[in-house]
């Protein structure tokens, strides 16, 4: 008897453990994010972004054996108790040019969660909740719909 896995939904998550002396200045990253949103411009290149991007791409390549290529870079800020609209980072009519994965990173977050929806064969409508905390990443297939929730009532996330 043999078994062949035809499809799987892989989720990758964990802390960004930068080497000593190469820590990411999340305040600078947050400032760049806010400036890009206020000015309605693309997320700017910065030393912090390059360090984070390089770490994540190399970590995924070494640990999981595949390479990531950036398609689109953006950041969001959520008001207290705000829940995002349903997010899906693919274009259903142009799957060839859509990203394979969505990667979220917690820049300066407090009590934030991500709900990722998926189907497991006949069991549709399943979801998985995971906390998004400071300096943590979550990566999953871009074909999965997700929500981001700012659970606390005091500040922006």
Residue ranges of model-derived segments:
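Non-heme Fe(II)/2-oxoglutarate
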Residues: 1-74, 82-84
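A general secondary-structure signal for short beta-strands and their flanking turns/coil
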Residues: 9-11, 98-100, 155
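Flexible, glycine- and charge-enriched loops at secondary-structure boundaries
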Residues: 45, 125-128, 156
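Catalytic core of non-heme Fe(II) oxygenases with the double-stranded beta-helix
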Residues: 69, 74-145, 149
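Short, compositionally biased
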Residues: 151-157
